[in-house]
Structure formats: structure tokens, C-alpha cells
Amino acid sequence: MNTNLLFIPLKQSSVLDLGDELRQVITNNYFQPASSFNSDLIYITQLRNQVAQIKNVNDELGKTSQDDSILLEYLQVLNTLQNKFSDDCVEFAWFDTLAYGPQGPYRYRSLKIEKLNVIYQIGSLYSQIAISESRHTDIGLKRACHYFQLSAGCFMFINNFLIETIKNKNDPLVLSIPLSMQSSTIQCLEYLMLAQAQETIWQKAINNNSMKDSVVARLSIQTSEYYSKALDFGNSSDLIKLEWINHMKVKKLHFLAAAHLRSSTIAADSFQYGEQVAHLRVASQAVDQALKSKKYVNSLVLEDLQGLADVIKVRLRTAEKDNDLVYLKIVPQEKELKTIIGVSMVKSIIPEAFEQKPESNTEIFKELLPYVIIHVAQAMRERQDEYVQTKFHTPISSLNNMLVKFLIDRDLPSSIDSIQQPENIPDSVIHHSQEILKTGGVDFIDKAFKELDKLKLECNHLLQECETRIDLDRSEDDMLRRKQGSTRWTRKSTDDAAQELIKKVDKMKQYLLQANNGDGFVLKKFYDIKPALDVYSSGYKALSQYIPNSQYIELPEQLSIVISDLRSCLARANTLESERKEFLQTLEIRSRDNSILPKLITEYNSNRSKYQTENGEFNFNAFESVYEKHMKLFDSDIKYIARTRDSQMTLEHEIDSINQKFVQEFKSLQNSSNEKRQQVLQYLETAYEKFLEIINNLTEGSKFYTDFIEKGSAVLQECEEYLYRRRVESRDLELAISNSFQQQQQVQEQNEQLSVPRNYSNDKLISPKTSKPGLWNPNSDIQFS
């Protein structure tokens, strides 16, 4: 395209079988057959491939219009997909083209990023449509201006989305923003399109011979300001190439010079000849600066600039000569000139299609269950599992531990085993040995401690990474604060800006310290009972050798009855534990088999308006009634917990009463061998109790560290996003400081150049009255010379 304006090249994307990708997602995650959506899947594959095949257009407006409709149609499809699928369901690949040649492919597993890329394509396409319009007619200029504004609106839409994303601290998309979507790049493109839209208005104005110079000057200065903003953002972007930077710089200075050229004409018409010279000097200086940046700039742009420069130079020489010889007006400096106030005739227009909902009769995947329903079902399933754990597993485990401790505190069953089985291994010890071997014994605990150490190492690494991010921001902020000075570097320090994050990291450190102390206590407990566990794990023979025999004691009839009653109570305790184990197994099966998803689907299909607003947003709270109704499934089981607790309390009371009788009856019959055997048996019972505690401690420790990793990873992501936002903030602040300094420097240089280098004598000169050239002043004498 042979033009003095810029168009934005389209990104490139490889062909993707999007339909097949979505088919796999439906098959793996939805309770609906993918074959039901074959036509939709084929359609979306064809549409995505059409998008990938769109090329940069030339002057074929019909082809451009068709490409426009394809992109807008695909955008509507993406809006539907966002309601039906998770954001990370498919991976897309794009090539950036803003810099020197295609770069990539850059891969993104995000429907949001795909949507932004499509909007970027639409903005690029609108810029090309605008340039393809004729600039020799008012209609062509009007259409070009409209498309440039639409293009600017596309990039404004992208930038607004990025701003909201960065504000949202919990959005993981912050770290996935493509380089071509960074704020400086997008804003450069937006203001470039606005500048070119304003330029078409300016061109239409100069084509009108009756247009006032003041209006043209204001249009020119506003065009220059738009190019100036585009240039500022372009300088801070990594993708805007030198050709574009120089183009925008030349355009900025060109329209600055054009504005002052028009202002000089206005000054001359008002007999302000000093101001006329000053405006022309500013214009001359502007074109001189522009010519210094002409490298790589389009020849048409340079021709326009050179033509303007020639006019300015001629008028400046004439105006200076007339003022020096005739008018003798003092030439003011640039800062003393009346400011030219720009008038903007353009704005960023977001295409209406971006906000439109797809028509119900053309919407694809209409019968596909929205992914949020799956998400809600998963969340409620997790709540259900947590409910079962909290209301059933934890209470029953606590009751069992209380029962074991209750018996061990009363030396049961070791006290009666030492009497009734003076030589044989008690059944309870054999049972404990089998349970320990089934669990894995010492090897299992050793392995569990090693796994715990790995988790702990990962947790410490997470903590270190969080601290590193904060320390990195602190060092960067301190360095820039020293470089720029605290007067100009006005943003918050790291300790203030990251106050909440620092609190979270400190809390993480405290949790890990407490957990480490707890691990040490559990490890000591393990070493205390390790000898007993080795005996338990060594088999029947080792137990026989470890447990000493005792002498046979003939028991009185009354004591035998008491022991028999105790045995009966202990058997009931074992039965109680077995019943609880069977109850939990049955409960797990029932919980697994009763999924809440079918109920959610039924409720959603029966009354969609209740669960989904007109804007397509879901009312998650409305599903709560479905969950509450579903959880009534466990009402009867709650009653079982109360019953088994009451049964245990009754049994413990009965055992305690009988055991007191046993202790009183047995005191007179106990001998040293019997006492020694009872102590060993009691040690083994205590070791088994501590073994169960250690297993429970290790399980809790593993859960703690796993949860810590999950939550710590979220904190680390917050630190990453915080560091990213702070770096963007630093770059913007540095740019603002740099621009302010450059503006001050330019003003100073201009003032030095515009100062009048003439020395007048101390004689007072009477300034002649001003008059337009060619008019005779009747007060002057007639002279012939």
C-alpha cells in the first residue's frame, strides 16, 4: 500500500483442529456424548482454519469485508465457548508480526488470550481497511476515519481487559499475557490509530478552502499530540520497530510545525508580526528536528515534510526581513506565545459486535452442559468429601483412640492376659502385630518420614521463592529511588506496597517453624517405641522370646467371674470397632455412588433462568438448595455417630467398674513373674497406641505440607503478579520522569534558539505604526526615492 500512513500487520496462526480438541474435552470431562455435537465441531474447525488463513490485504475491499465477518463470527463463537468450557481447555499458537518478521510460535492455553488475539486481528484489519479507502474524496476520508477509530477501539478494549486482569490479584492470566499484548504496545497502537484518524479529519479540513486557519491549527496540534503519545508508548515497547518510531516522531513534529505555520498566518492577519516570526521559528525548528529522524521513513512522508519545510523556510525569511526592516516588533520566546489548544474530532470506538450476544437459533453447543455446572459439581463433591471426613471419619477415629487409651490406662487387656495366658502370647498382642505388619511397620514409618522431608523441602523452597520476589522488588525499588531521587520517585516503598504479602510470608515462616518442631516431637516418639515395633514386626517366635512367662495362679471363683466379665466387655469393645470400620466402608461406597452432578443437571435444565442471568453469568448461590437437599442422604448416619458414642460411654463405665473389682481381688495373688509379664505386655500395648498416634501424626503432617504447598503456591503467584505489576509501574514512572525531563530540556533549547541575538543601542526607537502592505497612510508625506 503506497501511503503516508501505517497499517498494523495481522498476526499469523497455524491451522488447528479445534473441533477435535473440544471433542476430547467433552469426552473426558462431560457426561454427554461428543457425537451429539458433530456438526458444531466440524463448523468450529472450519471457522478457526479460515481465521488462520486470513492474510494482510491490499486494495481488494471485498476480500477485506469478508475477512472482517469471519473474525467477528469467530469472536461470537469464542464468547459461547467461554460459557461452555474451561478457559484452559485448548492450546492455541500465534506468531507476533509487529517487529522484524514473524516471531514465535507463542503458545497459550487460554480462551481469553485467544479472544484477545482475535480482537487484535480485527483491529489490524480495520487499520488496513482504513488505508485502502480513497483519501481524495470526502466520503473516502470519512470512511477511513471511521475504520481508524474502530481499530483504536479494538486496542482500547484489549488494554481495558489487561488493566482489569492486572488489578485482579487472583487471576493467573497475569503471568500469561503475551508480549504483543503488553500495555505499552497496545496503547501505542491505539494512539497511532487515533492520530491517523485525526489526520484524516485534518486533511478534510485543509481541502476546504473556507476553513479557518485557527481550526486547522487546532486540528494539527491535536494530531501531533496523538502521535506524541503513540511515540511515548512505542519507545517503552519491545516490539515497535525503529521504522515506526521514526515515522511517529516525524509525524509528531510535522503536525507541530503545521500548527505553528497556521498560527503564524493568524498572527500576520492580526498585525502581530513578532508573534508571526516566533511561530515560524518554532515551526522551522520542528521540521529541522523531524529531518534528523528521516532514516527508514516512508518517502511519501518525507516528501510531505520537505514540502512543508520549504514553505516554512521561505515564509520565515520573508517575515524576519519584514520585521527587521519595517515593523521592528519584539519577537517573543516560544513559552510566551499563546498556547495552541488542540481539538479532538476522534475517539476510540469499540465495535458493537464485541458486546452482542449470539442469537439463540445460531448458538453452537446449545445443548452442551456449561462447564461451570461441572465446576460446581466438583466443588460440591469436595465439600461432600470434607463433610464425610469431618462428620464421620474424624469422630470415629477419635472415639477409637479414646477407647484404646482408656483400656491402656487400666492395663487392659495385659493385666488379665498375664493371668489367663501365663505362657501363650495374648490374642490382642497377635492382633496388634498383624495390624503393624499390614501397615508396613518400621519401614513404612521410615518411608513416611522421608516423604515428609521431601514435602518440607518443597515448602521451604516455596517460602524462599516468595521472599526472593519481595527482596528483588525491594532492591529494584531502592536502586531506582537512589537513581531518580526520592522527590521524583513518589511511589510506595516495598514495605508499604507489599505489606499484606509480607504478612502472609511471615505467617508461612511461622507455620513451617511450628511444623518442624512438631515433626521433631513425632520423630522422638518413634525412636522411643522403635524397639517394640521391631519385636512386633519380627513374627511369633520373636514375640514369644520377648514376652516372659509367668507362674500359673489358681484363681478364686469370684476373680474368675470378674475376669470373665472383663473379657466379655473387651470383646464388645472389639465388636464396636469392627462395626465402625464396616460402617465407614459402607458410607464411602454410598457417598461415591451418589453423585450430585445428575441432580444439578436436572435442576439446571428444569429452570435455567433461575441459575443463569440474561448476561450469561451464573448464580452459584442458587445451587446451594440442591446441595442441601443432596446432603440429607447422610442424616441417618449422623444418628449412628451419636449412638456409637453413647454405646462407648456406657461400655467404658461398665469396664471401669468391673476393672476396679478385678484390681482389688488380684492384689493378694500377684507375684513377681506375673508382674514382670504384665509390664512387658503393657509396654507393647503402649507402643501400639503410640504407633497409631504416629501414623495419625504422619498423615496429618503430610496433609499439612500438601495444603501448605497448595496455598503457598498461590502466595508465590501473588508475589509473581505483585513483582510484575511493580515492574510495569516502575517502567511507567520512569517513562513519565524521562518525558518530563525531555520536555523541560526541549523547552530550554527552544528558548535559547528563539532568543533574539541582536544588540540595540541605548537610543530609544519609536516603533512605527503597523499597517498592511500595499495601503497608503494619509498621515505620511509623499516621497519619491
From Swiss-Prot:
GO BP, sorted A to Z: cellular response to lithium ion; cellular response to neutral pH; cellular response to pH; filamentous growth; filamentous growth of a population of unicellular organisms; filamentous growth of a population of unicellular organisms in response to pH; positive regulation of filamentous growth of a population of unicellular organisms; symbiont entry into host
Domain BRO1 positions: 4-403
Annotated segments matching region Disordered: 748-785
CDD domains: BRO1_ScRim20-like (cd09241), V_Alix_like (cd08915)
Record-level GO cellular component terms: endosome
Domain of life: Eukaryota
PROSITE patterns: BRO1
Comp. bias regions, Polar residues: 754-770
Physiological role: Required for the proteolytic cleavage of the transcription factor RIM101 in response to alkaline ambient pH. May act as a scaffold protein that recruits the calpain-like protease RIM13 via SNF7 to its substrate RIM101. Required for filamentation.
Protein family per UniProt: Belongs to the palA/RIM20 family.
Assembly and interaction partners: Interacts with RIM101 by binding to its two YPX[LI] motifs.
Protein's name in the database: pH-response regulator protein palA/RIM20
Gene name in the database record: RIM20
